[in-house]
């Protein structure tokens, strides 16, 4: 695509060297649009799917009025939020009040720059892709803190402090789990990590993917990922029975929609990261001799992402919400020690004769 646009502007339109630069910029913009539009549509229908799944688990119907089987409900919700007035508390900080939602949403979009869907479908294939993801996602905490403080509300500020403390705490356990994957893969490039899972003692089958040899740390990662995104049962930052809606409480209309969009995009991002790091990315679970279903492709990447997203919805519908002190205790006294201990165990394992990743 990049070469096509560069040839278009340089040769066809006669812009010379300037056309090469313009073609590069245009190709990047087109790639960004190709990623963002399906991502936003996915968020819209993820909310629909969530309400349907939870309704089914609770013996309800879920959305079924707007359009056939309620399929237009996400668009109705979007129009409702867009046309609602964005009210602001009189004593709030006006500038920071509107900066908060933007700072929460921007990192969730920027993180997708390094996520590959197969060997070729990636905006930027850099060797420190995992480090970039950890860095860019940690910036969203600033948006939460700013929103809570700028609202000039005790409920908003308490929710922001809870959310930021929880995210920072579980980032440590999550990072420890990802360090284990880097140790066995020898790279922070996502394509290299997927390629490493295609090898191994199990001959590139589903049993050679990182979820099995790193199973204890895989569980630590899954729990930390849910807490990191402030989703149920770790949603004390939005505890309805205690602090109404946390740092969202003073937001309405489009400003609230930005927070909502950021939360669900982070969910999808975590599902993509889980697929790449532990579930073989675009690798097929079937032998390549089986034809199409055995061929590595973006299709399998999307299937695995959907499975992880379903897991998010399943635990929301089945587990009660933890108290805040229980969440922090689980993170600092259970998951973080397990994460660091497994790094040591894995290091010893890799230098022993029983090394599976030679």
Curated annotation (Swiss-Prot):
One GO MF annotation is: oxidoreductase activity, acting on NAD(P)H, quinone or similar compound as acceptor
Reaction(s) catalysed by this chain, per the record, are:
a quinone + NADH + 5 H(+)(in) = a quinol + NAD(+) + 4 H(+)(out)
Q: What is one GO cellular-component annotation here? A: plasma membrane
Q: InterPro entries recorded for this chain? A: NADH_UbQ_OxRdtase_su1/FPO (IPR001694), NADH_UbQ_OxRdtase_su1_CS (IPR018086)
Tell whether Zinc is among the UniProt keywords.
Answer: no
Q: Name one GO biological process term.
A: aerobic respiration
Going by the record, the broad EC class of this enzyme is translocase
**What EC number(s) does the entry state?**
7.1.1.-
Query: Pfam families, per this entry?
Result: NADHdh
Q: Where are the transmembrane segments?
A: 20-40, 95-115, 128-148, 168-188, 206-226, 253-273, 290-310, 334-354
Membrane topology term reads:
Multi-pass membrane protein
Oligomer status and interactors:
NDH-1 is composed of 14 different subunits. Subunits NuoA, H, J, K, L, M, N constitute the membrane sector of the complex.
The family classification in the record reads: Belongs to the complex I subunit 1 family.
What does the record give as the function of this protein? NDH-1 shuttles electrons from NADH, via FMN and iron-sulfur (Fe-S) centers, to quinones in the respiratory chain. The immediate electron acceptor for the enzyme in this species is believed to be ubiquinone. Couples the redox reaction to proton translocation (for every two electrons transferred, four hydrogen ions are translocated across the cytoplasmic membrane), and thus conserves the redox energy in a proton gradient. This subunit may bind ubiquinone.
Cross-referenced NCBIfam families, in alphabetical order? PRK06076.1-2
Task: Name the PANTHER family on file.
Answer: NADH DEHYDROGENASE SUBUNIT 1, NADH-UBIQUINONE OXIDOREDUCTASE CHAIN 1
Q: What protein name applies here?
A: NADH-quinone oxidoreductase subunit H
Question: Which species expresses this protein natively?
Answer: Neisseria meningitidis serogroup C (strain 053442)
